[in-house]
Structures are given as structure tokens and as C-alpha cells.
Amino acid sequence: MAAPRGKGSRSSNSRGTRGARGKRQRGGRPAFETSRVEKINDDGLSGSDAEAESPPIDELSSDSDDYDADGEEKKIEKPYNTLLQLFNTSQDTNGPARKRRKVDHNSKKTEIQVEEQDELHDEADLSEPEITDDDEIEDPADVAAEEVEAGDSGDENDNSSSLSLNIKAISSKGWLSHKSELPGRFRLMFSHPDTGGDTVQLPAPIHGLQSLKLKQKLALHAGDHITKFDSLASGLAPSIFGYHDLLFGARTLSNSARFRDLYCLHVLNHILKTRDRVLKNNSRSQKVPDQDLELRDQGFTRPKVLIILPTRQACVRVMESITKLYHAEQQENKTKFYDTFSAADDKSWENKPDDFRELFGGNDDDMFRLGLKFTRKTIKYFSHFYNSDMILASPLGLRMVMDKEDSKKQDFDFLSSIEVAIVDQADALLMQNWEHVEYVFSHLNLQPKESHGCDFSRVRNWYLDGQAKYVRQTLVFSSFITPEINALFSSQMQNTAGKLKITPTYAGAILDLPLPVPVKQTFSRFDSTSPVNDPENRFKYFTNAVLSPLVRSSAGGRGNPSASGTLIFIPSYLDFVRVRNYLATSSQTENLSFGAISEYTSVRDVARARTHFFSGRHSALLYTERTHHFRRYQIRGVKRVIMYGVPENPVFWAEIVGFLGLDPAGAAEAAEGGVRALFSKWDALKMERIVGTKRLGNMLIEKGGDTFTFV
């Protein structure tokens, strides 16, 4: 198993020591525009020094009473609270009275401008009734249309005996897997619970949205933005809308927007189906109040969808997909959202790679969370979590509100009824702190600590029985798959409907190098008995077989030209610390001068290390993968590359090896120095992306030697 990334601390800056470029409030702290899951303690709290705490139970509405005929939440006003509110209003002389929003019923598109207020006081009174244009008598034609749509309840497993059999098989790890090839050099593995029955078949590919059961509100406009499917989308769309789990390990710049639109359409459709079912059952119960109807149509809390993203700008892209598919007449707090989540790209990044600009362009702050509430005519940003249909957040943003030192203040009940969980750009989350992702998933679909006003007579049986995780759909999109992501696939994707894993067939990063001359690329395999022992075995091999020749070449002194220009690339920060300390203290390396750059190195020290390396004052330079991920430096003066381990991201291979050609005059000499990379059998996933799928097998099992050279 790969070594932990980073220091394992709770906090993580968006771009190493640089921090986020997004807009911040006064005082230098990130703007914390977020849904509140905790009650606000007004005693002596103000501004950014205040922490939000859990709201009282009576302020939280259950799903069964959340909606009226318009899809709005019902507002129950208590006479005493109303009287107290009027009294407080009459006594307030500190400022003008709040203006009522004028409603224009003829407007097709209305953006509600909200006043920027202190975030604690802005959402302090959660029970304050909202004034919206949905508070009017509906057109009877609209009501009839919604009644037709409400009959489509979606895909559910209401057969308790079948569900029990599937859960029993999953609990005993009884999965039956089938592998196949997909068009476009993709590989598919479909796994479903092995209950001893007939083999489960995947749904047939589709060629457009007309084959999907979409709510009328979405079907009217979705075709304008999602046109004809390619072969990959045709095969995966039925599984996404069929509530299968999916691990998609082939996310690229070219297909990311297409799949983002697909999963946004899916979750919107799911939210509308859930809402219409509740509305329909509310109507049924009101028509026959004397009958004891079994209307189980919801979970413990309202939030049904969780989307985990790496940055605020990624959240903006998801919201752009949502708003173009869900035509709302009003978008409350839209301006506030774009002011605090979006930013312009850095013009100095024009020469940065495309994948870097996609991830870090705009607002790259990785500490955020956002609640979204949908009604028939409105999208409300920054809604309270327990009043939200969807939550968009970064792993760090969620953990900061879930994991409190005081156990009484911990709150993750809002994740108890998540039915669709999505992780986009999982490879970027690996470079932040993957432990936060694991923490969030370990708290999904747990039994809530409080009732939060829940009507338990309407809660589905699998929630009451603690089986919700077996019905939850999980979608994970990543540019590549790592052991950590595979562990998430194995341990957290437990859907009784089955799960898919999509991986591409790799040609190999060694074939696509940005160099004018061929470069010798050597891979040295070392023996490693287990993932636990792999770091120790790697270090011993490096110090004995790799470092010794490097030290001998440095014996001639600092001015020896053959000893300079060695870049040592180290993927893991823990390995970086170990190698750095060894080079600094070992008698073996007393004649080797070196510099070191990690994700925690200050800008000043980075500049000094690069200058000394380029001038030859330092013979070697240690350089970590996370540093390259966050900075994409162009290191000059490189004459040979030693890779302590191959990078997770195959794009980095070409970029690191490309350092050899940054000085055209010395390109031939650098090509002779070449690249040497260390690997073991536990690096199979990384090595497949570097050397290619066809070459990997022989390199892992070859008994005739442990060194492989490609030119």
C-alpha cells in the first residue's frame, strides 16, 4: 500500500504553501459561505471567531412535512414565536426595517439579490418563513402534469427478501464479476451479489436521452445541452440512471464535461422523483385520513445527494451544469455564490499544462461546503443542510463541520439519508488528503443521533434496519485508479444493484516524451514481500544499488561536472523525509551536495535550491510528486533523472523526463544520462500507465532479470 500522502494533518492548503487564490474576507481567512449544521450561540460570538452549533430539533423539518403542493417546505409558525418576532421588530431601532421582496409573477427569469451579511447572522434564524413566488395558487394544468410524473417512482428494491439475500452475499464478500472489452480501448468489470440465482446482465447501450425516463421539467431542456452520446457514454448512461455503482478511471479533459452533465441530470431527476413521490403520498394520506396507509417514501433527513469536489471552481462548474439543466425562474443567493466561489484564471499560467489549469484555474480553495434546495420554481444556494436536497463540498470542508473535539458538537446526521454520492476528480483529492474522503464515507448512512423532526412512519425500512448503504449509489470519476481508490471501490461501494469499474488500456507514457532525441529509460525491479515492507525494501535498494554509484561520481569534488545535474524524484513525502535525512547525516554521502524541494518548502528556499542546482553548486536535487502537482516547476540543469518511485499521474512522467531537454545545448548529454526508475510488484497500477498494459506483465514476472531498458 502506498505511503500516506502529506503529513496527514486535518488542514491542507489548496496549493501547498501558497494557499487559495479565491476571494477571502477581511482578516485573511477564507470566506466561509456555507450551509449551517449547527445552532448559533449568540452569547459573545461575532464574525469569523464564532463557531456554528447544531440547531434545535424543533427547527428542523422532516421529509414528510417538508413539501407543500408547490414543492416548497411547509412553514409552521407558532403563535408565541410570531408574537415575539413582531415585538422584536417593533423594538429594533438600530436600522431600517427589512424590505419585503416584490414578487413579479410574470417574470421568466428572476435573480434574487441578497445583501452580504455576516454569515452567522445571515442564517441564524432558520425558522423564518420565506417569501417566494411559489406561494400562490398553481395552474391546474401544472398540477395535473405533476400528478402524471409522480406516478414514476423510479427504480427501488421494495422486495425485502431479495434485498436480504443481496445484503447477505455482500456481507460475506460474495461478488460475481464479469470482464469485457468496450469500444475505444476500455475495459469493463461488472460485479453483482452472488445469490446463486441467474446472472445479472447490464442494461443495453442507449444512443440518446429519449431512452431515459426523465421528469418532464428536465426532458424539455436537457436535449439542448446533452446531444448524441458517444460509444462510452452510450454504454455507461443506462448504468448511471439505473443506479449501479460506478468507478470510472478514464476521466479526461475531453470527456469530463460530458459526464458532469450526465451525473447532474441524473441527480436532478432523482431529486424530482423523490419530491413528487412525497407530494403524491401526502395527497393520498389527506384524502383518506382515517386509513392506516403504509407510505414509506423517505429517509431520516432531507439531503439525498452528496457531490464531493476538490475546489470551489469545480463546484462552480457543477452548478453551471445544474442550472442549465434545471430551468428555475429564481436563483436565490446566486450572486453571493459566484462572488465567493468563482474567480478569474491566473494569466501567468498560460504556459501551464491543460490539466493544471483545469484543476487550479479560478478559485482553487479546497475548504468549502454548499447546501442546495430545489423547489418547483427556485434554486436556493446556501440553504441549511437539513433543509437541502443536495450538498456540494470538499472533503476538508465536510470534515471541519463533522469532526469536532467536543463529541457533543459533532454532527453528521445530515449524511444519514444520502442516496446518491458522487466523487469527481478523485485523483486531485488524493493529492489533498485522502483520509478526509475515507472519513466522510465512513459516516454516510449511519443511524442519526437525533430525530430532527423525522416522521418515522414514512421512513423506508432499509433505513430503519441500518441497510441504507446497500441501496446507496456511488459514482467515482478519476483520471486514473490507485490502491486508495480501489479500496474505496471494495469497501464503500456495496450497492445491491451491482457495480462497474472502467479502466483504459494504456499504450505507455514512455512513448510520448517531449524530447528532440531518444532517451534511455531504465526500470529496476526490487524484491518486496508485502506492501507493508515495501518502503523499507525500496530504501535499502536505493542506498545500495543507486546511491553508491552517484556518490562515487561525486568523489571528485563539487566542481566535477559529471557529478552535477541529478534530479531525484520521490513520490511519497515520508520517503522524501527519510532520503533527505539520510543524505544529510550519513557518512556515505558526506561528499554529495544536494538541495531539497517538497510541498512544504518556502518559496524563498525553493528559489535558492533551484539556483544552486542549476549552477552546479548542488550535485543533486530531491523533488516530490506533490510539489510537481501543485507547482509544475520547470527544473533547469537536469542531466539525469532518478525516480525513487514512478509517479501516480502518468502525465508527470513525460514532464519530469522532459526536464532533460530544457537546455537544447545539453540535450544530447542529458539523453545519455537518461532515466532510472525503481519499482516493485506493488507498483503495478502505476507501472501500467508508464510502460503500457502489454509490457507490464513480463516486467512483473520476468525471472531472467530485474532491469528493463527502453529507448
Swiss-Prot record:
Residues 1-137 are annotated as: Disordered. GO terms for cellular component: nucleolus; small-subunit processome. It is found in: Nucleus, Nucleolus. It comes from the Eukaryota. The keyword Ribonucleoprotein applies. The keyword DNA damage does not apply. Keywords: Nucleus, Ribonucleoprotein, Ribosome biogenesis, rRNA processing. One of its GO terms (molecular function) is U3 snoRNA binding. Residues 60-71, 113-137 have a biased composition (Acidic residues). Its main location: nucleus. Residues 1-17 have a biased composition (Low complexity). It holds the Pfam family UTP25_NTPase-like. GO terms for biological process: maturation of SSU-rRNA from tricistronic rRNA transcript (SSU-rRNA, 5.8S rRNA, LSU-rRNA). InterPro entries: P-loop_NTPase (IPR027417), UTP25 (IPR010678), UTP25_C (IPR053939), UTP25_NTPase-like (IPR053940). Residues 82-94 have a biased composition (Polar residues). Residues 18-27 have a biased composition (Basic residues). Component of the ribosomal small subunit (SSU) processome composed of at least 40 protein subunits and snoRNA U3. Belongs to the UTP25 family. DEAD-box RNA helicase-like protein required for pre-18S rRNA processing, specifically at sites A0, A1, and A2. This is U3 small nucleolar RNA-associated protein 25. The lineage of its organism: Eukaryota, Fungi, Dikarya, Ascomycota, Pezizomycotina. The gene is UTP25.
